[in-house]
Regions:
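Short acidic, glycine/serine/threonine-rich loops at helix termini
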Residues: 120-122
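A gly/proline- and charged-residue-enriched helix-loop-helix capping module
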Residues: 72-87
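C-terminus-biased signal that marks the final domain/tail of proteins
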Residues: 87-91, 100-103, 112, 136-237
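A contiguous strand-loop segment
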Residues: 1-71, 89-104, 109-116, 125-157, ...
């Protein structure tokens, strides 16, 4: 399970949390003293991360956590209480039946029993996609959802290049039997290929579109200007 976290605040840190429920390690902002985490793994092997989704339906106007984005609270609660991917679905069901969710998100989940699924969530509905049902056994998302609208005309802020580049890298690794943690860290997490750029060498000794020699614009690359932290979790059955 992997996520590049793209946010304006580059001061990020991991916390170890043990409040009497399931202990976990979670990613949050430096000096954050609220119960909000944006990726993590707990002591029983359940892990979660998310990305914003910009093509789903209506989000809730507010809920018991307030009026702001609730992805940090949802993931903190999941890490403290969930043991399996199915447990996370139960958590989402409880929110559907209550006040809903204020931020549309793609939640990637993973557990120690072999479960792996992506939940595309809007205010009062979600769509589950299991890795076991995917053609090659992996799931990739950026800032749009497969169950949402507009897939034939994806604007740049949805991250189409980031999605397509990561997807193609995973596909080539699976096809060549080279999908390893090292591949994800070295070839995917740090990838700087811009739109329509098949590959590149560093230092880059070429021209990309109208840029100066040796310059790759990194606003829409997998590892980009706003990438503030990385989350990755590997579990071997």
């Amino acid at each position: 399970l992997w996520k590049n976290r793209d946010v304006g605040n580059s001061n990020q840190e991991y916390h170890y949390v043990d409040d009497g429920r399931i202990p976990f390690i979670g990613l949050t902002y430096r000096n954050e003293d609220t119960f909000q985490y944006y990726a993590g793994v707990n002591a029983v092997g359940f892990a979660v991360e998310n990305s914003n989704s910009y093509n789903l339906g209506r989000a809730a106007g507010g809920n018991g956590w307030g009026w702001g984005d609730d992805d940090g609270e949802i993931q903190a609660l999941a890490l403290a209480t969930c043991r399996t991917v199915d447990d996370f679905q139960v958590l989402l069901d409880s929110l559907d039946n209550a006040e809903g969710r204020t931020l549309n998100s793609n939640y990637g989940t993973f557990d120690a029993f072999g479960g792996a699924a992506m939940f595309e969530t809007e205010g009062f509905e979600y769509f589950r996609h299991d890795a076991a049902d995917a053609p090659d056994g992996y799931l990739v998302r950026s800032n749009f959802s497969y169950s949402g609208d507009g897939l034939d005309n994806r604007p740049n802020y949805w991250g189409p290049n980031r999605h397509d580049r990561a997807f193609n890298l995973f596909k080539s690794a699976v096809d060549d039997n080279q999908l390893t943690p090292e591949f994800v860290i070295q070839r995917v997490m740090r990838n700087l290929a811009a739109t329509d750029m098949n590959d590149y060498d560093l230092p880059y000794r070429n021209f990309y579109e109208g840029n100066e020699f040796g310059v790759i614009p990194n606003g829409e690359t997998v590892c980009r200007a706003s990438t503030a932290s990385i989350f990755g979790y590997v579990f071997s059955l």
